[in-house]
UniProtKB/Swiss-Prot annotation:
Position of the signal peptide: none
Family (UniProt): Belongs to the UPF0473 family.
One Pfam short name: DUF1292
Designated name of the protein: UPF0473 protein SSU05_0068
Species this protein is from: Streptococcus suis (strain 05ZYH33)
Amino acid sequence: MAHHHDHEHDHNHDERELITLVDDQGNETLFEILLTIDGQEEFGKNYVLLIPASAEEDENGEVEIQAYSYIENENGTEGDLQPIPEDATAEWDMIEEVFNSFMEEE
């Protein structure tokens, strides 16, 4: 049974969820999972928003956020991250709406 996250849950900010991404050259970068979004009903996949684990805010108080779609494996512990196409307007609109709600709660 897969464990699906919903954007309406509380994050325990004392325990950071970390993930390692490996680029095409084999370089590993550690990221913190900022938010997971259940998009199964609308788009048939889930989404994750990541920030570099060592990220510091820039002069505007902002941190680079990366967004990916994924489909969890059967045991719900991992999945393959896929880039979200730039022209997937409905997906980006939903992600932005959920992210803005998440930030208002913080």
